[in-house]
Curated annotation (Swiss-Prot):
<dbReference type="InterPro" id="IPR041698">
    <property type="entry name" value="Methyltransf_25"/>
</dbReference>
<dbReference type="InterPro" id="IPR005271">
    <property type="entry name" value="CmoA"/>
</dbReference>
<dbReference type="GO" id="GO:0002098">
    <property type="term" value="P:tRNA wobble uridine modification"/>
</dbReference>
<keyword id="KW-0949">S-adenosyl-L-methionine</keyword>
<feature type="binding site">
    <location>
        <position position="39"/>
    </location>
    <ligand>
        <name>S-adenosyl-L-methionine</name>
    </ligand>
</feature>
<dbReference type="Pfam" id="PF13649">
    <property type="entry name" value="Methyltransf_25"/>
</dbReference>
<feature type="binding site">
    <location>
        <position position="199"/>
    </location>
    <ligand>
        <name>S-adenosyl-L-methionine</name>
    </ligand>
</feature>
<feature type="binding site">
    <location>
        <begin position="64"/>
        <end position="66"/>
    </location>
    <ligand>
        <name>S-adenosyl-L-methionine</name>
    </ligand>
</feature>
<feature type="binding site">
    <location>
        <position position="132"/>
    </location>
    <ligand>
        <name>S-adenosyl-L-methionine</name>
    </ligand>
</feature>
<dbReference type="GO" id="GO:1904047">
    <property type="term" value="F:S-adenosyl-L-methionine binding"/>
</dbReference>
<dbReference type="InterPro" id="IPR029063">
    <property type="entry name" value="SAM-dependent_MTases_sf"/>
</dbReference>
<keyword id="KW-0808">Transferase</keyword>
<comment type="subunit">
    <text>Homodimer.</text>
</comment>
<feature type="binding site">
    <location>
        <begin position="89"/>
        <end position="90"/>
    </location>
    <ligand>
        <name>S-adenosyl-L-methionine</name>
    </ligand>
</feature>
<feature type="binding site">
    <location>
        <begin position="117"/>
        <end position="118"/>
    </location>
    <ligand>
        <name>S-adenosyl-L-methionine</name>
    </ligand>
</feature>
<comment type="function">
    <text>Catalyzes the conversion of S-adenosyl-L-methionine (SAM) to carboxy-S-adenosyl-L-methionine (Cx-SAM).</text>
</comment>
<comment type="similarity">
    <text>Belongs to the class I-like SAM-binding methyltransferase superfamily. Cx-SAM synthase family.</text>
</comment>
């Protein structure tokens, strides 16, 4: 996935709320690589997990698919027969580019790209459902119902993979993780202005929760095992298993 370099916040500007529009979609691969520690590791491992748990004739859902990195990783590892991958994003700019990437990749496992709100998608016969840094952008009052519908749509033995930016339970710990993340971004070429303006643009729409809050929600939905399998600074990925 080739893209332009992310310079969206390189000049002083009147900062508005972050949106997944054409401007962001154009630079998204560069932005995500330079902003999320361990992103490639997370995506590849999600693909492995989807392949490991895929069963014949099942569905794999990538909710908030952006440009399709997770869907393509899953397609790479799935060997079960007659599986389908459903990639969903409510950003037309993202979904259009995702469809182009999928077409160019020519995966053996079919990938259907849908531009819609993930809450309009009926999850059924799923061996895996993935939300890779997606739930954090959804109204917290709607999150319980979303997770419950995912649990209900998973087949027994299926998994839900949830990657999120976390908020630490203590203010001191939270500030430490934020500082480490900002240093990560500096080392990846972002200026102080870019870091500050990006933080201002996203603070009203990315509402992070603690790991404990996610764990409680997943357990309340019915998941028997909740495993924190990856964390770097305040970025983490969780796999929840349905018996």
């Amino acid at each position: 996935m080739q893209s332009s370099k992310d310079a969206i916040y390189s000049q002083p500007q009147q900062v508005s709320d972050f949106r997944f529009d054409d401007t962001v979609a154009e630079v998204f691969p560069d932005m995500i690589q330079r902003s999320v520690p361990g992103y490639n590791t997370i995506v590849d491992a999600i693909g492995q997990l989807a392949g490991r748990y895929a069963t014949n004739n099942s569905n794999i859902y990538d909710l908030g698919c952006s440009l399709g990195a997770v869907s393509l990783a899953a397609a790479k590892y799935v060997v079960a027969d007659n599986c389908s991958i459903i990639a969903v994003d409510n950003s037309e700019a993202m979904a259009q580019r995702c469809a182009r990437h999928v077409k160019a990749y020519k995966a053996n496992t079919p990938i259907e790209v849908i531009c819609d709100d993930l809450q309009n998608i009926h999850i059924e016969n799923a061996s895996s459902v993935v939300m890779n840094f997606t739930l954090q952008f959804i109204d917290p009052t709607q999150r319980d119902q979303i997770i419950q519908s995912i649990y209900d749509g998973l087949a027994p033995g299926g998994i839900f993979i949830l990657s999120e930016k976390l908020r630490h339970a203590s203010e001191q710990g939270n500030e430490l993780l934020i500082d480490l993340h900002h240093e990560f971004k500096r080392r990846n070429g972002y200026s102080e202005l870019e870091i500050s303006q990006k933080r201002e643009s996203i603070e009203n729409i990315l509402r992070a929760e603690t790991f404990e809050a996610h764990q409680t929600r997943l357990q309340n939905a019915g998941f028997d095992d909740v495993v924190l399998w990856f964390q770097c600074f305040n970025f983490a990925s969780i796999v929840a298993i349905k018996s």
